[in-house]
Amino acid sequence: MPSFYEKPLFRYPIYALIALSIITILISFYFNWILGTVEVLLLAVILFFIKRADSLIRQEIDAYISTLSYRLKKVGEEALMEMPIGIMLFNDQYYIEWANPFLSSCFNESTLVGRSLYDTCESVVPLIKQEVESETVTLNDRKFRVVIKRDERLLYFFDVTEQIQIEKLYENERTVLAYIFLDNYDDVTQGLDDQTRSTMNSQVTSLLNAWAQEYGIFLKRTSSERFIAVLNEHILTELENSKFSILDEVREKTSFDGVALTLSVGVGASVSSLKELGDLAQSSLDLALGRGGDQVAIKLPNGKVKFYGGKTNPMEKRTRVRARVISHALKEIVTESSNVIIMGHKFPDMDSIGAAIGILKVAQANNKDGFIVIDPNQIGSSVQRLIGEIKKYEELWSRFITPEEAMEISNDDTLLVIVDTHKPSLVMEERLVNKIEHIVVIDHHRRGEEFIRDPLLVYMEPYASSTAELVTELLEYQPKRLKINMIEATALLAGIIVDTKSFSLRTGSRTFDAASYLRAKGADTVLVQKFLKETVDSYIKRAKLIQHTVLYKDNIAIASLPENEEEYFDQVLIAQAADSLLSMSEVEASFAVARRDEQTVCISARSLGEVNVQIIMEALEGGGHLTNAATQLSGISVSEALERLKHAIDEYFEGGVQR
């Protein structure tokens, strides 16, 4: 029987037909043997033709398969030899055993057989060793996606040059939105006559229009102090390469009576949604203004932010009206809360503790229980004397609690006030930030990309000398029943004195007003000086660090111990060394680099204002203020930290350090 008849689908019906035919023949033989004989002959003929048809079908199928196999073999050969896909076989020593003509033509060679991968495509060898499955590499000015089959020692090369060019073109042409804000327009133009104000407006508009025309930017003025700019990613790259020189140009050419206009620019990029672009641009502008203005902030969808500019000391812009409004808003929030928990940053300083005590008085003035969170394991030598003095006042010391106690007493109506920092990673106890919903942030540092989530109230003034100064102003507008005793006023004054280096840095008229208010409340300046005293041992140790100071770029002092003199330094001691260096002649900025423990290298940075050390420290994952900043680096040596520091300084002077 033909082979396909053996399949059940065909076999059973045929068996049934044959059985039926045999029965029919038998019946015919019974009645008429001649008819039976004829039927037998007919059945034999039918079976013969079925067999013959099966044979013909099998021959046709075999012929078709043979033709198809030949065609497939031909296609395979042509694919190997003619298709624009590179194929390469190599041996254990990374020598090429075979390569198709397309791949040879990519290297402008007639054949690659016998050549080493190190000579022809060296960048592929590390991928093979690293067990990478697929990667894009550059060979002879073209881009290839290499697929690696290690078991067969086979490489496929897909030319993706045009695809990458199209992707690059798409990226370059994506829309970018920028909001431009004249930081101090009202301050500069107030008091000017109409003609002078009009001249200044024309000058600013002319500068910005010329800048926009040079780079092909659409620019529209939306108000006296606001502009909107539309550009693309390619233009943004050019602006980044120029370090946004328009900032310096506007500042230099709009000076009036020693006061110049400055720009803040918020840029939204790398998304296709216009709404998201607008949100990113506004968020970037808020960030630039929160950091003191005179700078550009570029915020990307992944949360990363790049900064340009911000090298000048920001002008004092806050007013007593704003302080009064914030104070009243804080009073309302405190009144609606069940209790108040105040928290500063890790390893608190005088400013952090002084400001926390000030907010404690705000809570008490509004008849609410207030508590200050402090970790006994994080009390540094710089505040030990202050804490020791506070312990003499039981009523005040009883308000200090540990992070664990704070977690226990917090509830849904608790208010958390964070002072002297705005970064969740730096607070005394991050669990409180995650647990408590109602949060207020009071800080004087420039705003960074990391920020407390959804605060009810934010009072950030980078123009202030210290957080203690901001809190002192808030105290002045609290209910009259507020009473501040000597130790509380002294703690606030100590915070101001430490952050201003005894009123020598970042000191404005409002700083002296706050100090005067605290002195009137009984602040003891002699006690403050006792807080600031140091031991002979710490003085000698600090001198040892300063002894190995070198000058970099003529006016930058860098102090660090040689690698062969491994020694651990307290963070406060490192900061004091940087302060001491700043008092040297011809030193504009100082950096003290030392190991705090086995894993951590600390860098403290100080400046007189000409050099923005905050930007330099941000490049090293740190932060701070224009004249006072620091960072901590883990897992590196002091010499490696010095190299990274010098690289950040070089980038700063070349036109702006970015993150």
From Swiss-Prot:
Residues that, per the record, bind Mn(2+) 2: 351, 420, 444, 499
Subcellular location: Cell membrane
Membrane topology per record: Multi-pass membrane protein
Region (DHH domain): 339-496
SMART domains: GGDEF
GO CC annotation, single: plasma membrane
Pfam families: DHH (PF01368), DHHA1 (PF02272), GGDEF_GdpP (PF24898), PAS_GdpP (PF21370)
Positions annotated to bind Mn(2+) 1: 345, 349, 420
Coiled-coil segments on the chain, per record: none
Gene Ontology molecular functions: cyclic-di-AMP phosphodiesterase activity; hydrolase activity; metal ion binding; nucleic acid binding
Cysteine disulfide partners in this protein: none
Cofactor(s), by name: heme b; Mg(2+); Mn(2+)
Swiss-Prot/TrEMBL keywords: Cell membrane, Heme, Hydrolase, Iron, Manganese, Membrane, Metal-binding, Sporulation, Transmembrane, Transmembrane helix
Segments on the Cytoplasmic side according to the record's topology features: 1-8, 51-659
Protein's UniProt keywords contain Iron-sulfur: no
pH-dependence annotation: Optimum pH is 8.5-9.2 (for a construct expressing residues 84-695).
SUPFAM superfamilies reported in the protein's UniProt record: DHH phosphoesterases (SSF64182)
InterPro entries named in the record: DDH_dom, DHH_sf, DHHA1_dom, GdpP-like_PAS, GdpP/PdeA, GGDEF_dom, Oligoribo/pAp-PDE_c-di-AMP_PDE
Description of what induces expression: Probably transcribed under control of the sigma A factor (sigA), protein levels are negatively regulated by an antisense RNA.
Consequence of gene loss (knockout): Increased resistance to acid stress, increased sporulation efficiency following DNA damage (by nalidixic acid). Increases c-di-AMP levels in mid-exponential phase from about 3.8 uM to about 4.3 uM in strain BG214. Increased levels of c-di-AMP 4-fold during sporulation. Insertion mutations in this gene partially restore antibiotic resistance to the beta-lactam antibiotic cefuroxime (CEF) in a sigM deletion mutant. Decreased sensitivity to MMS and H(2)O(2).
Any one GO BP annotation for this protein: sporulation resulting in formation of a cellular spore
Region (PAS-like domain, required for heme-binding): 84-149
Purpose of the protein: Has phosphodiesterase (PDE) activity against cyclic-di-AMP (c-di-AMP) and to a much lesser extent against cyclic-di-GMP (c-di-GMP) in the DHH/DHHA1 domains. Also has ATPase activity, probably via the GGDEF domain. Overexpression leads to increased sensitivity to methyl methanesulfonate (MMS) and H(2)O(2). Overexpression leads to extreme sensitivity to the beta-lactam antibiotic cefuroxime (CEF), probably dependent on PDE activity. May monitor cellular heme or NO levels.
Description of its domains: Has a GGDEF domain (residues 173-310) preceded by a PAS-like domain (residues 84-149) which together have ATPase activity, followed by a region with a DHH (339-496) and a DHHA1 (591-646) domain. The combined GGDEF, DHH and DHHA1 domains have c-di-AMP phosphodiesterase activity (residues 150-659) that is 10-fold enhanced by inclusion of the PAS-like domain (84-149); PDE activity may only require the DHH/DHHA1 domains. The PAS-like domain is important for heme b-binding.
Family under the similarity heading: Belongs to the GdpP/PdeA phosphodiesterase family.
Identification of the protein by name: Cyclic-di-AMP phosphodiesterase GdpP
Native source organism of the sequence: Bacillus subtilis (strain 168)
Upper taxonomic lineage: Bacteria, Bacillati, Bacillota, Bacilli, Bacillales
